[in-house]
Amino acid sequence: MQRLQRGLVLLLWAGLGILAITALASFYVDLAWFAELNALPVLWTRVLARWGLGLGAFAFALAVVGSNIRACWRGASTAGAWAIALGLSGGLAWSLSQHWFALLLWLHQVPVGESDPIFGRDLGFFLFGLPFWETLQQWCFNLVLLTLITVALIYLVELGLSEQRLTLALSLFAQRHLLILGGALFLLRAWGHWLERYELLYSTRGVVFGAGFADVHATLPATTLMSGVAFLTAVGFWALARQGIRFNLPLFKSWCPAWASSLLAPALLWGAYLGFGLLTTRLYPQLLQTLLVTPNELELERPYIEHNIRFTRAGFGLAEVEVKPFPEEGSLTWEILQQNQSTLRNVRLWDTEPLLATYRQLQEIRPYYQFPYVDVDRYRIGGELRQVMHAARELDFAQVPPAAQTWVNRRFFYTHGYGLTLSPVNVVTAEGLPDFFLSDIPPRVSPRYPEVAQVLRVEQPALYYSELTTTDVFVGAEARELDYPAADRYVYSSYRGTGGVPIPHLWQRLLYAWHFRDLRILLSRELSPSTRFLYRRQIRERVRQVMPFLLYDQDPYLVIQGGRLYWFFDAYTTSSRYPYSEHLPGFPFNYIRNSVKAVLDAYNGSIDWYIADPRDPLIQAYARIYPTLFKPLEAMPEPLRQHIRYPQDLFRVQVQQFATYHMTDPRVFYNREDQWQIPNQFRKRRRLPMQPQYLILTLPEDPQKGSPNQPEFVLLSPFTPLNKQNMVAWMAARCDGENYGKLLVYEFSKQRLIYGPEQVEARVNQDPAISEQIALWNEHGSRVNLGTLLVIPIETSLLYIQPLYLEAEQGRLPQLTRVIAAYEDRVVMEPTLSQALEALFSPTGSRRSNR
């Protein structure tokens, strides 16, 4: 027996030792990784906040649970009582420690400077304070509830379940103990009801999101009253505990056992509380909503509709949208086109999907190189802004031949991708393929474009950090890395950057081997004192590890600057706690700002975090929590700042909200008299909403502005009326310089018909010459793909451009074969954009050749 006990003790200590080593290895891996990024304060803030909150909660819970257990379990062993107390306290402490960031936000909150319309409290209370107080109230309630249940079970188990022993169990001391805990529960419910008042600002009862007439005039006073009722119920429980009241009236003696009579008084109090709550907070508001509000909805809900409109526009960054009428004078002519060559030279003829397929066929070079995505950017080349598309040539180890997927190759040989391919959006070769500015391995600037050599030179093309990089590698070791394949040989290299963690000591290798469950890290002879370990190289994982509280745009993009490659991330601060702000279906937030731009060095893996919207209260609080992490946007080098762009994910959300919330008159909003929608386009054999498009264009001139507008990089999306196809407006997000982040909406006159994208698409499909040519191609073994229909504002008119791609049935090399152009009621199809525009507008051009 003693051997068994000793064996169990040894097994227990061995298990604890394994857990300790695992925790130590995991912590060291994090510590070294954050140190590599110069972000140790971020890690220490996280650790200290979590452990500080957890230990504080543990001590408080242990005091509450332990004292109550010892009070009722007076004859029990100390070990048994403490085992229960430690178990409950540990679980409760762990649950509260998960909310450490809510505590930090509360401690570092900032005022928003605007108050809610119902309680008059600064919005910072709802963003920072209310979530923390609700978490704390719920935790305290759970603590007392679990204590009450535990104490009640101890009384029952300790004294048995017979009526005689139950009577003993419910002695005066036991009654008082349970009643005191019951009173504490109701006191916490009183606190909970008080906090529930503020939750009315997120009500979904009325015609719009947020507190409506019934919420303010019925639910709010009822919830306030219930807070008082819960407090009085708590006082009633404590009064019963002090007096030890039993219901020994003759009415009850005849049928009520002695032990049950002890529960009758608190049960009546609890029942009265529930009944009163049901009447006041459920039945009365519903009756008021049905009998008074619904028949007079617009009249009674009007001020609350105004609140919803104002706060939704503020929550989604739409409060400062500048709405202008689109100029109607004049029409588009050949002469006007010649004056807008900067726009025409940047018409995007390549869609991402066909261009990506072409890049993969022509430029991946080796099977283990992959182009995961195509991105859009702009560069100033020869003094002119040029829109380009590019893709990073990333290493995908999964594509290495299976026979070569060895541990050595995974860890030492296949370590990085190489360079990128870049082409202008509007240039096509005679074969219908993209004409590259930058291509091949090593990256080579096309001799046809010598002016781009200085701007697009790439001196360090190695991509050690990218979107497909999921392997952890050792660099600077004895083994050579594959740098890139040349024509008749392979070129090898050795990492010379600052990324990764040095592992010169055996104990470090031991911890990494333990953490990654890979004994070969400890045994490999390839490792040397100069070896660096690069892990967490997938760029999305990398930024999320540092700042998991930001929401990241799904489209990071690569930028060339100073011969190096950088990944740009758009990051958002979000909240679901902005009062009166309407949620979009499928999105968990009702407040969003693009407050952070993160720049990640593709060679070294370092990350710089810049505050793009210093007015955002959330990022102000984050900057207080992590004072050494964030930099002002002005600290970003100017050449990099020229590549900041308005993010598509944010713009999509704003466009969807603005389709409804451009209506600021409550009556118009209530009736949805002017509801807009995003037009659809036929893609992949089904109708899909049009996606916003980056364009370089010159915005219509403002008569009050002295100087003419210059070409600029914008993100554009059109609007049509709900269930209609004519265009009513278009929205643009500006991306350049001091105008970055400004939103413009140009509205068309309601008396003028402007063809929308779906109508233009229908005209293209119905054009006899175009339809005949497409059918002819399809009959000869080719597959015709119509690209994105582009809406291009030029001065006071709209021009539509749509590329057409041909792809062999058995091939994967799309070719840009034709360009369709449409203006007003005219449609043409020509081999090139210039020919299409000439056919459409030139006095000497053929109006409808449709070749």
From Swiss-Prot:
Main location group: membrane
Transmembrane portions of the chain: 7-27, 47-67, 76-96, 141-161, 168-188, 220-240, 259-279
Keywords: Cell membrane, Membrane, Transmembrane, Transmembrane helix
Domain of life: Bacteria
Localization: Cell membrane
Membrane topology recorded in Swiss-Prot or TrEMBL: Multi-pass membrane protein
InterPro entries (alphabetical): UPF0182
Stored Pfam families: UPF0182 (PF03699)
Record-level GO cellular component terms: extracellular region; plasma membrane
Family under the similarity heading: Belongs to the UPF0182 family.
Protein's name according to its UniProt entry: UPF0182 protein CYA_1810
Organism: Synechococcus sp. (strain JA-3-3Ab) (Cyanobacteria bacterium Yellowstone A-Prime)
Taxonomic lineage from the root: Bacteria, Bacillati, Cyanobacteriota, Cyanophyceae, Synechococcales
